[in-house]
Amino acid sequence: MSELVSIIVPTYNTEKFIRLTIESVQNQTYTNWEMILADDASTDKTVAIIEEFAQKDSRIKLFKSLENRGNGFARNNALEKATGKYIAYLDADDLWFPEKLEKQIEFLKTNNLHFTFSFYDSIDEEGNNLNRRVESPNPLTYKELFFCNYVGNLTAVYDADYFGKIILETTQKRQDWRIWLTIVKQIKIAKPVPEPLAFYRIRKDSVSSSKFKLIKHNFGVYREFHGYNLVFSILLMIRFLFTQLIIKPKYIKKS
């Protein structure tokens, strides 16, 4: 029998996208999953839409927060409820290809791995394909990941029996990158499924679309997560920016 995959989905005011996101999970060829949605006190119809799905599909589970506490809290809340052998992440506005989970679980088992991710394609806020494919080094070393988050959150899967549930402080930004750093520091290198298995949605109001916020949050990874002093963190950020501007674009291609 196939092992259970727990899909972690934090939500907040995503009524425009959540229906398609849930449907992309329901369309998976790998069917042994639970989708754990932790809502961070949405003020729109997000909760009502999720409840509509949950009433018809017992694999979809909703947990509601009474107050808005941030994406990190919602993600941790969902993770605490997870019961699967594997943990997968998906944001409430992104989409999976139908064979995403099946290909990744098979890849993990065939190669005796405990963590993997994949390439992904990009769409705009309205769902139009931007013909922009994001790839990564293969294999991906800890040093490469240290200077650039090559792992798309919507593509990552790890073995919770091996690593345990990786729960980080909710106040920390770039929580996803910190999780991958924690994992790859332990296993030394990571291997992606070398094909796109998801659509990443680029929204006008997303954190990922704000370069200034990203620089600030990425600096926090070196300063707070790794614990480096101010001067060394600045030097690391210079190397990080070099990687972002010069090296990473080589892995962004037309789809």
Predicted region positions:
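Short, well-formed alpha-helical segments that are part of the catalytic scaffolds
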Residues: N13-N27
